[in-house]
Amino acid sequence: MRQTFMANESNIERKWYVIDAEGQTLGRLSSEVAAILRGKNKVTYTPHVDTGDYVIIINASKIEFTGNKEQDKMYYRHSNHPGGLKSISAGELKRTNPERLLETSIKGMLPSTRLGEKQGKKLFVYGGAEHPHAAQQPENYELRG
């Protein structure tokens, strides 16, 4: 009789992937990266175990938007003080801090639990074409779309 495979920390093999964000659409890239971080692209996926891989995203400043989202999409944060609501458009955030734009999008697609926080720490986003993770020997990852 066969038993169902259950992944645990001892039998997970993690890889490092590099994804070039140049010319990619924000949402399509984010959803695919979130699936890699969760481990859903593997046959050993187990919902309650972190089976995901590490992802390095380069050229985050060259991400693209569809439609008028660059002007219309707004990001909000609040300081918890009266009148402390801050807002910034997606285009302005892309110019000032493209790494935060991608991190916000991807981490919003991960679970809001301790496991989701752990999975989110395997994401590394860089605005330029260089990254300091050459020692991990990352593989290039081709997106489906």
From Swiss-Prot:
Q: What GO biological process terms are annotated to this protein in UniProt?
A: negative regulation of translation; translation
- What is the protein name for this chain? Large ribosomal subunit protein uL13
Summary of the function given for this chain in its UniProt record: This protein is one of the early assembly proteins of the 50S ribosomal subunit, although it is not seen to bind rRNA by itself. It is important during the early stages of 50S assembly.
InterPro entries reported for this sequence: Ribosomal_uL13 (IPR005822), Ribosomal_uL13_bac-type (IPR005823), Ribosomal_uL13_CS (IPR023563), Ribosomal_uL13_sf (IPR036899)
Cross-referenced SUPFAM superfamilies: Ribosomal protein L13
Kindly give the CDD domains that the UniProt entry links to this protein. Ribosomal_L13
Q: Which GO terms describe its cellular component?
A: cytosolic large ribosomal subunit
Q: Which organism is it from?
A: Staphylococcus epidermidis (strain ATCC 35984 / DSM 28319 / BCRC 17069 / CCUG 31568 / BM 3577 / RP62A)
Q: How does it assemble?
A: Part of the 50S ribosomal subunit.
What lineage, starting at the top, does this entry show? Bacteria, Bacillati, Bacillota, Bacilli, Bacillales
